[in-house]
């Protein structure tokens, strides 16, 4: 009974929010008149694609940016194939642990840059973070796995 009461109160609250104050949680920039010739600066993808959007914007060439965007997402799908370490866990692999946290920091930086306007300091930071993203995944992770395989005598 108390679960049904909680669900009904939640539904009531959401209905009141939607029916009486639909703009309460919206973005006020959505009400500015649009220029059909360019994309407004407040338009950006959802938060989980902001890292890929930052990589897209970091390359001035349109085709190169799109290829980098697609490859940044495909790399995440192909990461299990790039994992060459004999030991699956990172518990006894301190180099891989450090590299993982550097990659997490780089992804957070790219996500932050993807939400920023295209201005001077953000462009350079986005380009450096994009290069670091691909360098960590394609170069440093396989090298680190090989070194740790040799250290662990696998």
Curated annotation (Swiss-Prot):
Q: Which Pfam families match?
A: Cytochrom_B_C
User: Which SUPFAM superfamilies does the entry link to?
Assistant: a domain/subunit of cytochrome bc1 complex (Ubiquinol-cytochrome c reductase) (SSF81648)
- Coiled-coil stretches are none
Q: Which GO cellular component terms, listed alphabetically, does the Swiss-Prot or TrEMBL entry include?
A: mitochondrial inner membrane
Q: Per the annotation, how and in what number is the cofactor bound?
A: Binds 2 heme groups non-covalently.
User: What is an annotated GO biological process for this record, any one?
Assistant: mitochondrial electron transport, ubiquinol to cytochrome c
List, separated by semicolons, the cofactors it needs: heme
- Which GO molecular function entries does the Swiss-Prot or TrEMBL record give? metal ion binding; ubiquinol-cytochrome-c reductase activity
Query: Which domain of life, per UniProt?
Result: Eukaryota
**The entry's keywords:** Electron transport, Heme, Iron, Membrane, Metal-binding, Mitochondrion, Mitochondrion inner membrane, Respiratory chain, Transmembrane, Transmembrane helix, Transport, Ubiquinone
Transmembrane parts of this sequence:
1-21, 63-83, 95-115, 122-142
Instruction: Report the membrane topology from the UniProt record.
Output: Multi-pass membrane protein
Q: Where in the cell is it found?
A: Mitochondrion inner membrane
Main localization of the protein described in the UniProt heading: mitochondrion
**What Gene3D superfamilies does the database record attribute to this sequence?**
Cytochrome Bc1 Complex, Chain C
State the remark under miscellaneous: Heme 1 (or BL or b562) is low-potential and absorbs at about 562 nm, and heme 2 (or BH or b566) is high-potential and absorbs at about 566 nm.
| Quaternary structure and interacting proteins, as annotated | The cytochrome bc1 complex contains 11 subunits: 3 respiratory subunits (MT-CYB, CYC1 and UQCRFS1), 2 core proteins (UQCRC1 and UQCRC2) and 6 low-molecular weight proteins (UQCRH/QCR6, UQCRB/QCR7, UQCRQ/QCR8, UQCR10/QCR9, UQCR11/QCR10 and a cleavage product of UQCRFS1). This cytochrome bc1 complex then forms a dimer.
Q: What does this protein do?
A: Component of the ubiquinol-cytochrome c reductase complex (complex III or cytochrome b-c1 complex) that is part of the mitochondrial respiratory chain. The b-c1 complex mediates electron transfer from ubiquinol to cytochrome c. Contributes to the generation of a proton gradient across the mitochondrial membrane that is then used for ATP synthesis.
Family membership, please give it: Belongs to the cytochrome b family.
Tell me what this protein is called.
Answer: Cytochrome b
UniProt organism field: Cervus nippon hortulorum (Dybowski's sika deer)
